[in-house]
């Protein structure tokens, strides 16, 4: 007996880095595409990039989420849901099918510096989750998707160990605030 497969791949579009969602022309295109294709999730990454002006060294928990809120406010107001990658992906350039992908050197520096300390990362993520629950409500945030990117270019035991340590911390922190 065959069953109809649920079309889960047709309800999400990739936007690129989160800061693109601050641009009005990108927002207009998303609204137009939503009307045409009726998707539910917007997938983006680099929510901790410098464009959001969040001081990652602020350990008193008073992070400035104002610019990040603009992204979430837009999505929620349009009836869309975030699908956030909590990792920091470099912009990659693919010249042709045979070439190697290259990342932007400017981004490479903040990719490696921002969350070298797991406690610092946990403190920030804890504050972010508290903020999201307070601003948007647990019921809403429970419907959001979150993932954590692994850089495929780092195939080593140390890279895997660090990734899974970070992933475990992210999973525990997110689950503390959200059942989704």
Which residue ranges define each predicted feature?
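Mature N-terminal, pre-catalytic/accessory segment of carbohydrate-active enzymes
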Residues: 1-40, 44-47, 58
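Substrate-binding cleft and catalytic face of glycoside hydrolase catalytic domains
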Residues: 37-180
